[in-house]
């Protein structure tokens, strides 16, 4: 349901913006495409009815001077940013029937201070040069859920390349454990006589972190680990 909603919202926002500004193009007049990446429960095929959407917007336009081809042209960068803003507005506007979804965009490069819609070359450079280990963990459960197949293919190639990097196992273990302990300190609601099934020791998030560690540790040698974003099939593969 969520993926159908995302695709429809994207189509509506796209139609609205292209009617005003035209289509984003490069010097050859070609549209380089736009895609929505789903992270977390959405990317991992575990979305519940009460879940929010962890999203990242990427596009294929890398020329900062490229413009749309309509009567009121704007730069491609502005167009894609407005597209993302319009989509978030449509997801989160409250109506008498409620809202579609809460949206979390903090997993994009540089978090809340980063561009709302990121050129895919910038996304790739960030993942190679600046991303923290926890951001690579997040890639384990990331996949394109709507958008241009060309951008989807480029994203998947980047994802696989990052996850298949050979890493220092000792540093990886320290990084993963440090992040897990930070999360536990803030989120674990276990108490005497009560166990937090999600955040408690041995709970759901511990299992997720173990799976993510395993992918980052061994995907360099066992590429079949790159084929899934959900914990069930990753556990079966392991």
Predicted feature residues:
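A nucleotide- and high-energy phosphate-metabolite-utilizing enzyme signature
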Residues: 1-238
């Amino acid at each position: 349901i969520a993926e159908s909603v995302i695709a429809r919202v994207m189509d509506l926002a796209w139609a609205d913006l292209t009617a005003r500004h035209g289509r984003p193009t490069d010097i050859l007049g070609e549209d380089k495409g736009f895609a929505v990446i789903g992270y977390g429960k959405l990317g991992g095929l575990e979305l519940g009815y009460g879940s929010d959407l962890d999203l990242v917007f990427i596009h294929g336009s890398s020329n900062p001077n490229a413009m749309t081809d309509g009567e009121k042209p704007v730069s491609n960068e502005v167009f894609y940013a407005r597209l993302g803003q319009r989509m978030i507005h449509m997801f989160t506007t409250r109506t008498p029937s409620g809202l579609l979804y809460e949206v979390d965009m903090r997993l994009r490069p540089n978090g809340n201070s980063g561009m709302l819609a990121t050129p895919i070359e910038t996304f790739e450079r960030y993942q190679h040069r600046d991303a923290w280990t926890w951001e690579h963990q997040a890639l384990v459960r990331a996949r394109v859920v709507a958008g241009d197949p060309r951008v989807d293919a480029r994203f998947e190639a980047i994802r696989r390349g990052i996850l298949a990097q050979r890493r220092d196992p000792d540093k990886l273990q320290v990084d993963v454990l440090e992040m897990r302990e930070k999360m536990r300190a803030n989120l674990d609601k276990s108490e005497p006589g009560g166990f937090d099934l999600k955040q408690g020791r041995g709970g759901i998030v511990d299992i997720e972190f173990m799976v993510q560690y395993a992918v980052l540790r061994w995907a360099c040698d066992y590429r079949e680990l790159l084929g899934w974003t959900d914990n069930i099939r990753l556990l079966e593969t392991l």
